[in-house]
Amino acid sequence: MSNLFREVGLHAGLGRTLTLIGNPRFWKQLILLLHQATPFDNALAIFYPLDGPPRALEEYDAEPSSKPASMLTYLNGLYLLDPFFQACREGYPSGLYRLEEVAPDHFRQSEYFLSYFHDNVLEDEVQLILQLPEAGTLSLSLGSQRVFSHDEIGLLTTFSAWVLPLMEQHWQHSQARPQGPAPQEMASQIRDALS
């Protein structure tokens, strides 16, 4: 019986997500839907344009803490060392990728791991990468304090068959709307919130 209620909850969450396509709240709802199906500790929806710095679209922490300064560090250039960013730039096809598929050898000794990943993403990461021809890349990162299980990766791989098209539809609809704050404005908003 509990599986039935879990399935009902997932379908209801998917319905809510569909109604928010083109709405700024889409990313939060999509993240909550995925969190309902597979446990993870943090998530980041981000757009990497072909030129210029990335734009954070939604940040989620299952257990909120005060780490906005780390996001500023990431957006102000540390993203260049992110193996997922590099995978996006190298033209990996749209899909779900595990950290071990994109990280270089000795990743855990890298500057990026030591200065950002270990404290913010934690232990493991998967990303849903959507290539947007002539625009850039949309990415939805899911981070965990533990390694994702084979079952969780299988479920996320199955979900990617509809998550990626939803991300693409949302992107197309949201381009008709005025854009959110630029990275510099977001950085200013984060600094203001901390003071």
Predicted segment positions?
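Inter-helical turn/loop segments and adjacent helix faces that build the functional surface
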Residues: S144-D151, H170-S174
